[in-house]
């Protein structure tokens, strides 16, 4: 058996190797733990190049304009998954087209999902009775604010929901949700 010369032997000692191994493992674990945190603050967007989020049905399938209008009539307000997966109402206007805005269905009082009451022609919160008109403006408390607005755009038959940052047309104030 031949012996290696001192030039052929690596210069890293056992202690240095264990320190490097420990540091590498700790770094890997820390980065792995930080990934979900970073993903929470910077979620991936579903949607087209316009920066919107694809509106999705209850099964998570993207909604198309033609498919939606085939099953929803004028005046209809139905829930979809909108921005950040929040329940959002798509509104079919009097002309039979999807409206230019949607309404976040989360009550501004305690966060309950507010259903549309077609008989009363308004949104009525089941938790504490807050009421909102057809455009989501609060008309009876205890909810302090109107429902949040979202832009609804159609791109290549896909229904996209986008952040609303302009003045709230219902109150002529800056949006509280932006």
UniProtKB/Swiss-Prot annotation:
Its cofactor is [2Fe-2S] cluster. Its EC number is 7.1.1.6. The chain crosses the membrane at residues 20-42. InterPro entries: Cyt_b6_f_Rieske (IPR023960), Rieske_2Fe-2S (IPR017941), Rieske_2Fe-2S_sf (IPR036922), Rieske_Fe-S_prot (IPR014349), Rieske_Fe-S_prot_C (IPR005805), TAT_signal (IPR006311). It comes from the Bacteria. Disulfide bonds join 112-127. [2Fe-2S] cluster binds at residues 107, 109, 125, 128. One of its GO terms (biological process) is photosynthesis. It is found in: Cellular thylakoid membrane. It is an enzyme of class 7 (translocase). Pfam families: Rieske, TM_PetC. Residues 65-161 form the Rieske domain. Keywords: 2Fe-2S, Disulfide bond, Electron transport, Iron, Iron-sulfur, Membrane, Metal-binding, Thylakoid, Translocase, Transmembrane, Transmembrane helix, Transport. It catalyses: 2 oxidized [plastocyanin] + a plastoquinol + 2 H(+)(in) = 2 reduced [plastocyanin] + a plastoquinone + 4 H(+)(out). One of its GO terms (cellular component) is plasma membrane-derived thylakoid membrane. Binds 1 [2Fe-2S] cluster per subunit. One of its GO terms (molecular function) is oxidoreductase activity, acting on paired donors, with incorporation or reduction of molecular oxygen. The 4 large subunits of the cytochrome b6-f complex are cytochrome b6, subunit IV (17 kDa polypeptide, PetD), cytochrome f and the Rieske protein, while the 4 small subunits are PetG, PetL, PetM and PetN. The complex functions as a dimer. HAMAP family: Cytb6_f_Rieske. The Rieske iron-sulfur protein is a high potential 2Fe-2S protein. Belongs to the Rieske iron-sulfur protein family. This is Cytochrome b6-f complex iron-sulfur subunit. It comes from Prochlorococcus marinus (strain MIT 9301).
């Amino acid at each position: 058996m031949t012996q290696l010369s001192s030039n052929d032997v690596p210069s890293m000692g056992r202690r240095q190797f264990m320190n490097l191994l420990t540091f590498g493992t700790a770094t890997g674990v820390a980065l792995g733990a930080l990934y979900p945190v970073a993903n929470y603050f910077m979620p991936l967007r579903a949607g087209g190049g316009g920066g919107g989020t694809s509106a999705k049905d209850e099964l998570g399938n993207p909604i198309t304009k033609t498919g939606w209008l085939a099953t929803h009539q004028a005046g209809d307000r139905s829930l979809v998954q909108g921005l950040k997966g929040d329940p959002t109402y798509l509104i079919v206007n009097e002309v039979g087209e999807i409206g230019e805005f949607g309404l976040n269905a989360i009550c501004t009082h305690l966060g309950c999902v507010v259903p549309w009451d077609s008989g009363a022609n308004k949104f009525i919160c089941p938790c504490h009775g807050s009421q909102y008109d057809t455009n989501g403006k609060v008309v009876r408390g205890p909810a302090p604010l109107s429902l949040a607005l979202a832009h609804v755009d159609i791109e290549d038959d896909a229904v996209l929901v986008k952040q609303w940052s302009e003045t709230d047309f219902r109150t002529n104030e800056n949006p509280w949700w932006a």
